[in-house]
Amino acid sequence: MASSDDIRGLRPPIAAAYDKTRRTVLEGGIVDQAIKDLCARYLAVDDEVVAHSDDPARFDERERAALAWTHAVAWDDTKADDDLWARLHVSFTEPELVELGYFIAFTLGQQHWLATLGAPGAPGPPR
């Protein structure tokens, strides 16, 4: 299978748009990279992250709120209730929430798109 960059390269404007997203959101921006990486691991159904996503001994409140939102975006939007939004607003600014939400949605979409192209390890709902 061709690399994801090779696939995007078939349409240079798409490759350029992805490069900008990578620089400004996926690998840059105002949200701590460690939080984004943790959310990406959750989306990839990393058992270590999923099994302990609400464990205060493993993750601080900011991380747990981000993981709860990741779950809501990816698998159960009903979890994005007033309580979750209150938790998110304690830990993140509005601009950070915009960036983190975009990161979660973009990463989830990329994982599913690449899986349809035959990439190994297609994500699914946490067990």
Task: Indicate residue ranges for each PLM-predicted region.
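Hydrophobic alpha-helical segments
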Residues: M1-R127
